């Protein structure tokens, strides 16, 4: 097994990177928070691809849930291929791009501003032209991410969104707990999941969740494809019941992710039904008695649980990839900057 994996090193650095981010954060959350409180922003539109699009799904659900704002994920092709026009007055378009170099996202940012939108650019690249063109800019500040597979930038993007939402809602206790979180994350990594409990011979299945957890399940599914060449598909546990559950048997492996919020109890209920259909079931949860449980320590504020889950997940999936004899530093056919338009 490879011992000097770049992506593993980066994933293990997440607690340290979050601590540094907290200490050095110069992002102006209050300027946007004030606009939201004054109801000057009526709609949220996100534009992103890959792992950043999984973060955008997190954005969409959180803003809709917490603020009652309509949210929409804009396919870049509507701008770059179809030349579609929209009325984006009173709309904040959030562009999330770790590299800051995707030409389709750069084109979208310019186009939506011409349609009346204000834009928030969230990137890890201080040399990106988007920094100067965006109405607002938030720095992910994760340090250089050398690996093809994004890890630390995803977690810090979620932290940015949680900080913005907590500032809007004046949840000072969440912000205080976020400052203390790196210590907990380090303990969680030091007591991480056992990758050896996963059935390596099965390469297809589902990752099932609801609510905010569904955004995480999309990123988890992407990493199974990217690093392990396994076709694990993300589903809402409700949508699974509308047809896909017909696929489930002992040739499938199922991961379920339940958070400590309103969605969690529903996922647990659906998990109990799925248990009867396959012996390859793995629960990502803070409370389970299964031998195949993947436990995380719940936070005082459930808003922070996604950071804990993903901080544990990344080193675990990378070690699983290595155990399968793969090289997670060089995912097949992939490169750091994907050129699409």
Model-found features: residue ranges?
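A broad, structural surface signal
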Residues: 9, 16, 23, 56-57, ...
């Amino acid at each position: 097994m490879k011992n000097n994996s770049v992506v593993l090193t980066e994933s293990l650095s997440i607690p340290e990177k979050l601590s540094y981010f907290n200490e050095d954060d110069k992002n102006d959350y209050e300027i946007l928070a004030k606009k939201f409180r004054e109801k000057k922003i009526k709609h949220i539109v996100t534009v992103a691809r890959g792992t950043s699009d999984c973060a955008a799904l997190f954005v969409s659900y959180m803003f809709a849930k917490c603020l009652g704002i309509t949210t929409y994920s804009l396919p870049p092709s509507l701008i770059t291929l179809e030349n579609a026009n929209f009325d984006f007055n009173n709309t904040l378009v959030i562009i999330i791009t770790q590299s800051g170099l995707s030409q389709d996202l750069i084109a979208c940012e310019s186009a939506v501003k011409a349609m009346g939108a204000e834009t928030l650019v969230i990137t890890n690249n201080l040399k990106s032209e988007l920094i100067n063109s965006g109405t607002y800019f938030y720095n992910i500040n994760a340090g250089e991410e050398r690996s093809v597979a994004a890890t630390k930038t995803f977690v810090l993007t979620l932290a940015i969104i949680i900080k913005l939402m907590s500032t809007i809602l004046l949840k000072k206790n969440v912000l205080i707990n976020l400052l203390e979180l790196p210590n907990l994350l380090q303990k969680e990594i030091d007591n991480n999941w056992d990758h050896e409990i996963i059935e390596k011979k099965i390469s297809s299945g589902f990752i099932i969740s609801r609510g905010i957890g569904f955004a995480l399940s999309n990123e988890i599914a992407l990493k199974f494809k990217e690093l392990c060449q396994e076709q694990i598909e993300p589903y809402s546990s409700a949508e699974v019941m509308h047809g896909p559950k017909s696929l489930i048997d002992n040739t499938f492996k199922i991961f379920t992710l339940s958070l400590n919020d309103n969605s969690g109890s529903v996922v647990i209920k659906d998990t109990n039904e799925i248990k009867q259909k396959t012996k390859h079931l793995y629960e990502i949860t803070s409370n389970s008695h299964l031998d195949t449980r993947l436990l995380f320590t719940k936070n005082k504020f459930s808003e922070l649980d996604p950071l804990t889950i993903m901080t544990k997940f990344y080193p675990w999936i990378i070690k699983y990839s290595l155990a399968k004899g793969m090289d997670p530093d060089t995912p097949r056919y992939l490169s750091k900057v994907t050129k699409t338009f």
